[in-house]
Regions:
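A charged N-terminal "starter" segment
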Residues: 1-118
Length: 123
């Protein structure tokens, strides 16, 4: 994101052009900024290489999730809907953590059958 000639740009596209192309308000994400932020974040953990999981509850946009997956991060989900979504986006089961309270037997069975990495049991 930057300014050129007193106009605000995201990845070389002016916000003015976007507002003429899309109904406002809208969300605008920078793929290059997201990739860079993930790279910088991961750099701090090079020695330990933990599985860093993105909270799908915070933003379940499929295109955003694909970028996150393509950068090697995992997914932290709290519902069967989120679990199904990240599987559809292409997250590997061994990079999915199922958190949250109030899991149904159906949700737990589904998660176990998909062989996800971890189910957090909370009160």
């Amino acid at each position: 994101m930057n300014y050129k000639n007193s106009k605000f740009y995201v990845e070389n596209i002016s916000i003015g052009k976007l507002t003429r192309s899309f109904q406002t308000p809208f969300y605008c994400y920078s793929k290059s900024r997201l990739n860079q932020n993930i790279k910088n974040f991961n750099k701090n953990f090079e020695k330990t290489k933990p599985l860093i999981c993105f909270s799908v509850k915070s933003n379940s946009n499929s295109k955003l999730l694909k970028i996150i997956k393509d950068n090697g991060l995992g997914a932290d989900v709290v519902s069967i809907g989120e679990l199904q979504k990240v599987l559809k986006v292409g997250f590997k089961p061994n990079k999915i953590v199922f958190s949250g309270v109030g899991k149904t037997t159906n949700e737990l069975d589904f998660a176990i059958k998909k062989k996800i990495l971890l189910i957090n049991v909370e009160s």
